[in-house]
C-alpha cells in the first residue's frame, strides 16, 4: 500500500502534498511558458508532465544526448514523453570537448550543466519560451551540487525545490498520476562511475554502459559498475573480441578494474558461483582486466572510495 492509500497515517502527508502541488501549478502558470531540462529521471519526468498539464502547448521538454547518458535511458525517456503526449526535443551536447569536464574534477557536474544551459538559453529564446526549469527538489538542499551553481548563473528555475517538494513527495505524486518513474532507482550519469581525478572518456563510458546493461539484463536493479584505472601498459580501448564495442580509431587506455555494486538484497544472488563466473566472463569480454564485487553494495558516490586521498 502506498503512502497515498493509507487512510489515517497519511492524512497530514496528503494535505501537505496537495498544498505543494497547488503551489507548483500556480508557479508554472506564472511562468507563462517553459522549457524543462529533461533526463527521464523521477524529478524531470514529473516536472515535464506537470508543465505539459498546466501549460498545454506552451511547455517543451529537452533532453541532452551525450555519451554520459545510457542509450536505454534515452529510449525510455523518449517513450515516456510519447506515452504521456508531451513534446520533447533531443539536443546534442559537447561537454567532452571541454578539458575541464574530461579531467573529472570534483565539480565536473558544473561543466556538464554549463554546457547544457548554454545551449538551452538560445533554444528557449528561439522557441519563444519564457522560462527554463530543471528538476532539482527540496531533498537536494544541502547536498554538494555543482550543477546548481551553473543553474544560478543562467537563471534556471527549480520549481520543485521552490515549492518545497521532496523526493518522497514527488514519487507519491508520480504514483497518483500513473507515471512509470514512481519507483525508478536514482540514476546518476555514467561519468559518476569514474573516480574524480581519473579522466572521463567516451571509451570508458561505453565499457561501463555495456557492463551495467549486462547486469540489468540479468535482473539486477540497483547497479553501478565503478571503473578504476590500473597501472600498466596501455591496452586497446575495447575488447577486440567484442566488435560492437571495439573502436579501432580510439587511443589505447590503461587496463581497468570493474568494481560492481548492487543493492544489499541483490548481493546473495550475484554471489552464486554460476552467476559470478558468467558476469566476470562477460565483463572481461567487454574489456576489463579484473572484475570485483563490492561487499558493501550500492551506495551513492561509491566511485570515489578508492580515489587517492589528499595528504594532511
What is the predicted function of each stretch?
Residues 2-176, 233-240, 244-245, 250, ...:
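ATP-dependent adenylation/nucleotidyltransferase module used to activate substrates
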Residues 73-74, 186, 271-275:
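Residues at alpha-helix caps and immediate loop-helix transition turns in enzyme cores, especially N-
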Residues 164, 202, 269-273:
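Ordered, soluble secondary-structure elements with a strong preference for glycine-centered loop motifs
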Residues 165, 171-215, 219-231, 235-238, ...:
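Mid-to-C-terminal catalytic subdomains of enzymes
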Residues 206-208, 274-277:
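Charged helix-capping and loop-helix junction motifs
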Residues 255-272:
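A short interface-forming secondary-structure element
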Residues 294-301:
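A short, acidic, flexible beta-alpha connecting loop/helix-capping segment that sits on the rim
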Residues 301-312:
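Short, low-order "capping/linker" segments at domain edges
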